[in-house]
C-alpha cells in the first residue's frame, strides 16, 4: 500500500492549533490545488468531541469560504480527520499559511456568534447523516480554545520523519 503524505510527518512534534501545507499538486489543466492540515488538537493528547466536531463541520465550511475564497482561492472541501484532531481543507490556489490562519481565526469568531442550534446549516434528516449528533456548545468550546491558544504554522521540514525512522516503522 502506498505511504500517504500525512503519515510521513512526526505527529509527536506537531503543534496545535496550527496550519500546515499537507500537499500541493496541479490538475492536468495546470490549476494549483493545495491541501491544508488544520490541526485543532495536539495528536495523541487531545481530541475533539464527536458532537462538537460534527457541528463544527457544518459551520466551519461556510465560514471559511466567507473569509478565504477570492483572490485566486476557492475552497473545494473541508472535512474532519478520522482521528478527530483536525480538518483537511482542499482548495484551488496557493494561499500562504498566514492567510489561512487568519481566515481560520475569523471563522472561529463566527462560530461563537451562532446563538442557537437551529442556526446550524443542513441540520435536518434530509441533509445530514446523523442530524441528532450535534452540540453547538461543544463547537463553541472548540472555537474558543482555538482563539485563546492562537494559530501557529507547522513546517513540513521540521516535522518530516527521517527515512531511517520510516524504515524502522516498516513503512
Curated annotation (Swiss-Prot):
The keyword Ion transport does not apply. The keyword Iron applies. It catalyses: S-(5-deoxy-D-ribos-5-yl)-L-homocysteine = (S)-4,5-dihydroxypentane-2,3-dione + L-homocysteine. Coiled coil: none annotated. Gene3D superfamilies: S-ribosylhomocysteinase (LuxS) (3.30.1360.80). Binds 1 Fe cation per subunit. Its EC number is 4.4.1.21. Its cofactor is Fe cation. GO terms for molecular function: iron ion binding; S-ribosylhomocysteine lyase activity. It holds the Pfam family LuxS. Fe cation binds at residues 54, 58, 128. One of its GO terms (biological process) is quorum sensing. InterPro entries: LuxS_sf, Metalloenz_LuxS/M16, S-ribosylhomocysteinase. Keywords: Autoinducer synthesis, Iron, Lyase, Metal-binding, Quorum sensing. SUPFAM superfamilies: LuxS/MPP-like metallohydrolase (SSF63411). Involved in the synthesis of autoinducer 2 (AI-2) which is secreted by bacteria and is used to communicate both the cell density and the metabolic potential of the environment. The regulation of gene expression in response to changes in cell density is called quorum sensing. Catalyzes the transformation of S-ribosylhomocysteine (RHC) to homocysteine (HC) and 4,5-dihydroxy-2,3-pentadione (DPD). Belongs to the LuxS family. HAMAP family: LuxS. Homodimer. This is S-ribosylhomocysteine lyase. It comes from Escherichia coli (strain 55989 / EAEC). The lineage of its organism: Bacteria, Pseudomonadati, Pseudomonadota, Gammaproteobacteria, Enterobacterales. The gene is luxS.
